[in-house]
């Protein structure tokens, strides 16, 4: 087992440091800020995310999705985190913290790990609010979750999927050193897609790329450019 992997685990930590971000398990308290970010980002998200509809900007929809995320977490099939930008946090007096014990900071987006039935792959997926793009946040979060995903029991590889036309999303696994395993046809689900899905893979046994930190949480991980 590579040195940067720990012992296999059924579930990941509920809170992780990821360079400029804190990744925290999504909770009902996050529904309002997620709904607001989706609403402000619909034009940015709609070309690539089939779920990016006006209904997704409703807090009631997000409360339902948080409940679904809780069920996935408890069954060990999906693990959804909110990304909070620590580098945007104002200074606070020693010994104080924001709500839920997190440092103050701005919501950036969400990222998740998904187990696939009868498969040893763990898929990482993410979205970033339109006001927070091009700051390295998705790269930092995916960098932190890659070794965490490989620590899940039975995980043999990590995958990142994106349509071939979504060059911004594809730049993230490429930057991190993932291998483009294949491009396969798929049904177009969002208007910007070409119907050609890129499957980027990180196999168990590969060592982290230069600049990656040791340890499952990626505590010292360096922020990327995208």
Segments predicted by a language model, with ranges:
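A short helix-loop-beta-strand connector motif used in the catalytic cores of GNAT acetyltransferases and
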Residues: 54-55, 67-82
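Acyl-donor (CoA/ACP) binding surface of acyl/acetyltransferases
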Residues: 1-33, 37-47, 80-226
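Conserved GNAT-fold acetyl-CoA-binding loop/helix
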Residues: 46-67
């Amino acid at each position: 087992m590579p040195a940067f992997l720990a012992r296999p685990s059924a579930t990941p930590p509920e809170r992780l440091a990821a360079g400029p971000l804190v990744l925290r398990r999504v909770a009902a308290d996050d529904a309002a800020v997620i709904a607001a970010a989706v609403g402000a980002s619909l034009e940015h998200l709609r070309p690539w995310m089939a779920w990016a509809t006006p209904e997704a900007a409703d807090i009631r929809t997000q409360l339902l999705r948080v409940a679904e995320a809780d069920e996935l977490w408890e069954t060990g099939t999906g693990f959804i985190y909110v990304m909070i930008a620590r580098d945007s946090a104002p200074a606070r007096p020693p010994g104080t913290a924001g709500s839920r014990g997190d440092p103050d900071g701005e919501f950036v987006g969400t990222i998740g790990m998904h187990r696939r039935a009868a498969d040893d792959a763990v898929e990482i997926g993410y979205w970033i609010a339109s006001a927070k793009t091009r700051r390295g946040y998705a790269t930092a979060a995916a960098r932190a979750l890659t070794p965490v995903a490989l620590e899940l029991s039975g995980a043999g590889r990590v995958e990142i999927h994106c349509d071939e036309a979504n060059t911004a999303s594809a730049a993230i696994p490429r930057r991190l050193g993932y291998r483009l395993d294949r491009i396969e046809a798929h049904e177009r689900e969002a208007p910007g897609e070409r119907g050609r899905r890129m499957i980027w893979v990180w196999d168990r046994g590969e060592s982290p790329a230069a600049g990656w930190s040791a340890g499952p949480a990626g505590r010292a991980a360096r922020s990327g450019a995208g």
